[in-house]
């Protein structure tokens, strides 16, 4: 309550101003976000701390647990957002209302009144801290499970915690640019805003209709019941690759039709986990972003990949058409461990004898698209947002600046988080990372100058990527450029490369996550200091749980991530960790000079940097030449070029299913059923998330842990139905289970 600096009459004063001034610049925000605030509502309550910490711990454990699975379903904070509602109301009824430490500065009550939406938002912020995973876990997995090296717990934990907290510093530097302007609207936040409204607003039921909470409960129960089919009884519907059935013994047909190992033409998944696993909820994607992603996917997957493969570029036919694996020149798997010396560096002599590492052409092109996305992002933001960014930078600390409607309410009613809070966290983290680089250098391999360079890259790209994410719901990654830079400057050290990538790339990603939460707090009128406190505590708790869970699974599950030793039907294949490990070999152990430089076979891939830099100019020039055609400005090359950045480990079926659903809801329903979309779209997304997540947990706890499965044709996965999709088509190449041409 001490954060309130104006009474609620100020809100009414703002609401009485000119309608044009009050109208949000983004229509979806205008339709979804409430324009009211009650600054007297209690926020940092006993209920909030209890339910928030509980949700954070549970989700952190569950998400880290499922991260190692073939379809790494991420249980979003929406699941906890729903589950805590009855618990919050129950606590409001049964907890004592007595005041503790009455009359002092610290007085509080375990039950200050009805369970309110602001408590609920902060509980969800705690839950969001546990919704996902800590990217630095990949380093732990790579070292222990793939490189088969020992890793002490303390440096592992310090890596995890510094990765997460470094982002707070960057978030503080750029929050005014990426939170306060109305144009920076962060589309996925509207799912949670809509759900909060459904759960807390008293909505009158129309005759023959449903309230949003009734609709949500129906979707929740339905999706919960339905997921028993793709999750256990009929798993084949996670990827229906029907084209493979037309040619059971044809490698070509399998390559074209496989949704998991091929191009996925016609493949579709009737499974919410398949649809939303890698790209997030399609219901939260703006139409122009959906169209850009779809164009990018179609051009890359159905035009570029087949052309490169059948022209045999980079000996494409010697390897699978779609794979993140590393291969010998004859098509067999590359024995990475054989080229590492005792100091965990590249053994140059053995590498020279063994021969260079080869990739599938798709994997090589994926890296090229990463180069293009990076340069396209810089040029696009400078061309289309550069002037606005410059104005925002100049006016960020000016008193009389134009502000978004919701920002004006927050400025009137609450005190901001002082910048020195962010500076303290930033300085402490950089100091701790420096300590790690000196004291545990044998483990992390990263020198002090590498730490500073990683921080510089994160600072430079946070506002650029932030503009893209805040307006399109797509977030181009920096993993390629960070790997490239340190790979050239400090080659043959895989752990140094991984650590540099985590500090340079993931600290930026974390910053954008914190900024997105700040925007959610702005939409829901949460006191900024309370929001900051929830973020810091939630992040700390989640890191502890993530680290402990990952460490436990690495010890407890035999042959975790090792496909060669796991049972054929095992889910513990770790697709994300495998890609991360392969990247550490390419960029860290072998180094970009031997792969993409003058010593490598893939040097031509560097031309993608130029392609990405040039592409946005065509759109920019077209907007100047044809200003009446507003659709031209919606052509977004960073999104088009980065559309398949998650492939692999994402598969074709994830994209085909996502694009169809996103287009149906983002175009047809938004255009022709606007009122239905406004009322139910984001609520539907939340219900599907929650129901699928709850059934996934139930399946694992009831039968998954015991290894109880059903053996019948409906549980044959895509790799069984399209078993020849990963076969080479070059003459004389021998691969187990494949015909020799």
Curated annotation (Swiss-Prot):
InterPro entries xrefs: Oligpept_transpt, OPT
A Pfam family per the record: OPT
Q: Does the keyword Metal-binding apply?
A: no
Provide a Gene Ontology MF annotation, just one. oligopeptide transmembrane transporter activity
Q: Which UniProt keywords apply?
A: Membrane, Peptide transport, Protein transport, Transmembrane, Transmembrane helix, Transport
Disulfide-bonded cysteine pairs: these are: none
Query: Could you confirm whether the keyword Protein transport appears in this record?
Result: yes
What is the first-listed, main subcellular location in coarse terms? membrane
Q: Name one GO cellular component term.
A: membrane
Give the UniProt subcellular location, in the record's own words: Membrane
- TM stretches of this protein: 48-68, 121-141, 153-173, 215-235, 287-307, 320-340, 362-382, 419-439, 448-468, 537-557, 602-622, 650-670, 683-703
Which intervals of the chain form a coiled coil? Answer: none
Q: Name one GO biological process term.
A: protein transport
Entry-linked PANTHER family: ISP4 LIKE PROTEIN
Q: Which family does it belong to?
A: Belongs to the oligopeptide OPT transporter (TC 2.A.67.1) family.
**NCBIfam families recorded for this chain?**
ISP4_OPT (TIGR00727), OPT_sfam (TIGR00728)
- Describe the function of this protein: May be involved in the translocation of tetra- and pentapeptides across the cellular membrane in an energy-dependent manner.
Q: From the Swiss-Prot or TrEMBL record, give the protein name.
A: Oligopeptide transporter 9
Encoding gene (name): OPT9
């Amino acid at each position: 309550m001490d954060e309130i600096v104006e009474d609620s009459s100020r809100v009414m004063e703002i609401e009485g101003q000119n309608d044009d001034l009050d109208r949000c610049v983004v229509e979806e925000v205008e339709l979804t976000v409430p324009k009211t605030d009650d600054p007297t509502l209690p926020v940092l309550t006993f209920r909030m701390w209890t339910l928030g910490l509980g949700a954070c711990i549970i989700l952190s454990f569950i998400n880290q647990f499922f991260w190692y699975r073939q379809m790494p379903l991420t249980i979003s904070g929406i699941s906890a957002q729903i589950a805590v509602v009855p618990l919050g109301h129950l606590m409001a009824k049964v907890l004592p209302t007595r005041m503790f430490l009455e009359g002092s500065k610290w007085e509080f009550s375990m039950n200050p009144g009805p369970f309110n939406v602001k408590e609920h938002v902060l509980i969800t912020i705690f839950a969001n801290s546990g919704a996902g995973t800590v990217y630095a876990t990949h380093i732990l997995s790579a070292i222990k499970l793939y490189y088969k090296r020992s890793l002490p717990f303390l440096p592992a934990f310090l890596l995890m915690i510094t990765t997460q907290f470094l982002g707070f510093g960057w978030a503080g530097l750029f929050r005014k640019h990426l939170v306060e302007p109305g144009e920076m609207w962060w589309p996925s936040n509207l799912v949670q805003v809509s759900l909060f409204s459904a759960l807390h607003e008293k909505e009158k039921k129309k005759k023959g209709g449903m309230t949003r909470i009734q609709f949500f409960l129906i979707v929740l129960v339905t999706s919960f019941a339905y997921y028993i089919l793709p999750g256990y009884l009929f798993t084949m519907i996670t990827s229906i690759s029907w084209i493979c059935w037309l040619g059971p013994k044809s490698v070509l047909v399998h390559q074209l039709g496989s949704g998991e190992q091929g191009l996925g033409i016609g493949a579709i998944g009737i499974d919410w986990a398949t649809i939303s696993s890698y790209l997030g909820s399609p219901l939260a994607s703006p139409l122009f972003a959906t169209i850009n992603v779809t164009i990018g996917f179609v051009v890359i997957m159905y035009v570029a990949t087949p052309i490169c493969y059948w022209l045999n570029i980079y000996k494409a036919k010697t390897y699978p058409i779609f794979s993140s694996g590393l291969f010998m020149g004859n098509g067999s798997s590359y024995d990475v461990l054989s080229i590492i010396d005792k100091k965990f560096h590249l053994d140059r002599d053995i590498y020279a004898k063994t021969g260079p590492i080869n990739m599938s052409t798709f994997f090589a092109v994926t890296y090229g698209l990463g180069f293009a996305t990076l340069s396209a992002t810089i040029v696009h933001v400078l061309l289309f947002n550069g002037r606005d960014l410059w104005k925002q930078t100049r006016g960020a600390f000016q008193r009389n600046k134009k502000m978004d409607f919701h920002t004006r309410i927050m400025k009137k009613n609450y005190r901001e988080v002082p910048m020195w809070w962010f500076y303290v966290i930033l300085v402490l983290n950089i100091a701790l990372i420096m300590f790690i680089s000196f004291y545990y250098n044998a483990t992390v391999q990263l020198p002090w100058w590498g730490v500073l360079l990683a921080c510089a890259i994160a600072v430079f790209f946070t506002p650029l990527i932030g503009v893209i994410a805040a307006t399109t719901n797509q977030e181009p990654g920096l993993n390629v450029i960070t790997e490239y830079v340190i790979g050239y400057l400090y080659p043959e050290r895989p752990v140094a490369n991984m650590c540099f990538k985590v500090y340079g790339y993931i600290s930026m990603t974390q910053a954008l996550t914190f900024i997105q939460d700040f925007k959610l707090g702005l939409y829901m009128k949460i006191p900024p200091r309370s929001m900051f406190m929830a973020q810091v505590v939630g992040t700390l708790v989640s890191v502890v749980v993530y680290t402990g869970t990952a460490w436990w699974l690495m010890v407890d599950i035999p042959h975790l991530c090792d496909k060669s030793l796991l049972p054929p039907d095992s889910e513990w294949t770790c697709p994300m960790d495998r890609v991360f490990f392969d990247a550490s070999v390419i960029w860290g152990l072998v180094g970009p000079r031997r792969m993409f430089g003058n010593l490598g076979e893939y040097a031509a891939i560097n031309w993608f940097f130029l392609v990405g830099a040039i592409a946005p100019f065509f759109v920019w020039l077209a907007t100047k030449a044809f200003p009446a055609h507003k659709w031209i400005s919606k052509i977004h090359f960073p999104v088009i070029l980065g559309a398949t950045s998650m492939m692999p480990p994402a598969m074709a079926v994830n994209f085909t299913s996502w694009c169809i659903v996103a287009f149906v809801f983002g175009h047809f329903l938004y255009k022709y059923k606007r009122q239905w979309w406004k009322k139910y779209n984001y609520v539907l997304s939340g219900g599907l998330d929650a129901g699928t997540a709850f059934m996934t947990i139930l399946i694992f706890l009831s039968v998954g842990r015991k290894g109880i499965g059903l053996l019948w044709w409906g549980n044959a996965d895509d790799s069984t139905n399209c078993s020849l999709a990963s076969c080479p088509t070059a003459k004389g190449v021998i691969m187990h289970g494949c015909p020799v041409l």
